């Protein structure tokens, strides 16, 4: 979603083709009933880097993120309630009401997750290397990644490998004993997946919910004022400010290829759009 804004900011002539009559893809706010608007797909902002927010000056384009203030969880019989408070002391007391052991374990759990996230956070804005390539850029990137793991040390490297391959349930069992607390903590490990909490690798998904930040608060989630479509409209404003163009109701019918390279597209109405660089998000 962000690459088009950076291309336009760098001085390139950018044209965005959108098949719908609105922009945003999954980050949209739609009028479901007259006068009632709803974030119909993406519902919360957690992984949007604040460096991007600042680079594109999205606040000036109308984007305001409001901190997400927590959740309420019920036991399967409905006889117990666990409230996730944003205030640290209130959250501790709520956990202690269910399990003093788990309340004391939470700080260790959060510290370990933060440590794992710190390594991954370094890679988010880097280009993944091609391990089969001998190009200097790919070799340099592979060496950089190897250095990050080498610097961990043998014991910590073992802990990282174990974490990235284990299930969310097994990871949570290492810290907590109360089933309601574990259930509440496990749900972020399967959101957006077809996995269960015992699926290998699901522990890693927990990191996706502590790697983001809202207004400098690392690990926080945010709600966009005006719905998630406000993010897309702010990005559109940044694109247009740098000379970019957005065409809605412009579905792509055909990809144009010449000498093995993509050179443009043909729209449903027959219009041909040519470009030196074509970035596609089509589903095949």
Feature map (PLM): residue ranges:
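General beta-strand structural signal in soluble alpha/beta enzymes
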Residues: 183-184, 248, 267
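N-terminal glycine-rich phosphate/pyrophosphate-binding loop and immediately adjacent elements
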Residues: 3-132
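A conserved short coil-to-beta-strand element within the FAD-binding core of flavoproteins
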Residues: 248-261
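Active-site/ligand-binding neighborhood in enzyme catalytic cores
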Residues: 114-242
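Core beta-strand elements of the Rossmann-like FAD/NAD(P) dinucleotide-binding domain
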Residues: 268-277
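Hydrophobic beta-strand scaffold positions of dinucleotide-using enzymes
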Residues: 52, 279-280
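Conserved small/polar residues in nucleotide/adenosyl-binding loops
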Residues: 1-5, 283-284
């Amino acid at each position: 979603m962000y690459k088009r804004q950076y291309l336009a900011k760098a001085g390139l002539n950018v044209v965005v083709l959108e098949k719908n009559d609105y922009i945003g893809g999954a980050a949209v706010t739609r009028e479901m009933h007259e006068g009632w608007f709803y974030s119909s797909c993406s519902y919360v902002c957690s992984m949007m880097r604040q460096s991007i927010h600042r680079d594109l000056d999205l606040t000036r384009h109308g984007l305001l993120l409001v901190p997400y203030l927590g959740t309420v969880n019920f036991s399967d019989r409905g006889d117990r309630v666990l409230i996730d408070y944003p205030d640290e002391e209130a959250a501790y007391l709520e956990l202690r009401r269910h399990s003093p052991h788990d309340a004391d374990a939470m700080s260790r759990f959060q510290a370990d997750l933060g440590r794992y996230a710190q390594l991954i956070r370094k890679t988010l804005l880097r280009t993944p290397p091609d391990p089969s390539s001998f190009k200097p850029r790919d070799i340099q990137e592979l060496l950089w990644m190897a250095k990050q793991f080498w610097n961990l040390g043998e014991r910590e490297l073992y802990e990282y490998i174990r974490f990235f391959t284990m299930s969310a349930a097994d990871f949570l069992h290492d810290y907590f004993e109360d089933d309601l607390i574990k259930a509440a903590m496990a749900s972020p490990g399967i959101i957006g997946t077809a996995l269960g909490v015992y699926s290998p690798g699901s522990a890693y998904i927990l990191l996706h919910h502590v790697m983001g930040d809202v207004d400098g608060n690392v690990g926080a989630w945010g709600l966009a004022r005006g719905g998630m479509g406000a993010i897309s409209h702010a990005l559109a404003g940044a694109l247009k400010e740098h000379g970019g163009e957005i065409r809605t109701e412009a579905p792509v019918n055909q990809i144009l290829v010449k000498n093995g390279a993509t050179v443009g597209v043909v729209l449903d109405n027959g219009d041909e759009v040519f470009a030196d660089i074509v970035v596609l998000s089509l589903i095949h």
